[in-house]
C-alpha cells in the first residue's frame, strides 16, 4: 500500500517495483496497469465487478496499481468500501494470482487494512510524506539548473515566500511538487 498526496511519486515507485520484480523473476512483465478507481463512479455493481476483473486480466504477469487517489471519491459515500469489497472478492477467487499495489490518499491508509482477514497479503505500507519548503526549493533550483539558469537573491526571496504559502496548510501542500515543477517550467518558458 502506497499512501500520500497526489504527485508524491506513488506511480513512479510502482513502476520501479514492477521492473525489480521482473528482474527477480517474480513477474513476467515489468509493466504496471494503472486502474483509476474514480472511473467506476456511477457503475452498477455487476459493471464494476466486470471492470475490476478486466483490470486484473490486463495486469496479469505484471502489477495492478489500484489507485484510489482522487478527490472525487470523497463525495461518493461508501464507494471506496464497495470497490474494495469487489476487489477482495476477485482476489479471493484466485488467491496468489495477482500482484496489486494499492495507492490511496494520505490519512486513509487504515481503510483497506481494516479488512485484515481478506488482506493478509498486504505486508508493507509506504507513506509518502509531503515535501518540506527546503525540498521544494531544491526541486525548483534543479529544474532551473538544467536550463543553466539561476535565481537572483530577490527571486529567491519571492520564491521562499511563495513556497511557504504552499506548505502553510495540509490542503495547500497537496500536489505541491507538481505545482513547483509547473512554476519552474513557466519560469523557463518566460525567461
Map each language-model feature to its residues.
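Walker A/P-loop
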Residues: 1-30, 54-57
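Conserved nucleotide-binding/hydrolysis micro-motifs of P-loop NTPases
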Residues: 6-8, 39-41, 70-72, 105-110, ...
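Short glycine-rich substrate-engagement loop in P-loop NTPases that contacts/grips substrate
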Residues: 29-59, 81
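Conserved ATPase-coupling elements of RecA-like P-loop NTPase cores
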Residues: 44-48, 70-84, 95, 111-113
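Substrate-engagement module of ASCE P-loop NTPases
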Residues: 56-58, 83-98, 143
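Structural recognition of the conserved hydrophobic beta-strand(s) that form the central parallel beta-sheet
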Residues: 65-67, 85, 97-106
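A short helix-turn-beta junction within AAA+ P-loop NTPase domains corresponding to the substrate/partner-engaging
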Residues: 112-130
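Conserved AAA+ ATPase small/helical "lid" subdomain
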Residues: 126, 130-132, 137-191
Amino acid at each position: 500500500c502506497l499512501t500520500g498526496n497526489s504527485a508524491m511519486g506513488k506511480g513512479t515507485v510502482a513502476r520501479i517495483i514492477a521492473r525489480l520484480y521482473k528482474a527477480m523473476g517474480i513477474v513476467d512483465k515489468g509493466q504496471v496497469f494503472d486502474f483509476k478507481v474514480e472511473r467506476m463512479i456511477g457503475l452498477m455493481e455487476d459493471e464494476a465487478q466486470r471492470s475490476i476483473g478486466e483490470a486484473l486480466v490486463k495486469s496479469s504477469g505484471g502489477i495492478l496499481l489500484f489507485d484510489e487517489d482522487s478527490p472525487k471519491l470523497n463525495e461518493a459515500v461508501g464507494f471506496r468500501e464497495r470497490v474494495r469489497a469487489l476487489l477482495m472478492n476477485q482476489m479471493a477467487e484466485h488467491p496468489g494470482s495477482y500482484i496489486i499495489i494499492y495507492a490511496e490518499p494520505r490519512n486513509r491508509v487504515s481503510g483497506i487494512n481494516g479488512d485484515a482477514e481478506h488482506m493478509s497479503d498486504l505486508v508493507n505500507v509506504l507513506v509518502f510524506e509531503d515535501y518540506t519548503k527546503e525540498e521544494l526549493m531544491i526541486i525548483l533550483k534543479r529544474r532551473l539548473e538544467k536550463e543553466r539558469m539561476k535565481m537572483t537573491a530577490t527571486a529567491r526571496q519571492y520564491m521562499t515566500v511563495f513556497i511557504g504559502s504552499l506548505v502553510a496548510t495540509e490542503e495547500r501542500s497537496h500536489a505541491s511538487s507538481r505545482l513547483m515543477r509547473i512554476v519552474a517550467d513557466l519560469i523557463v518558458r518566460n525567461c
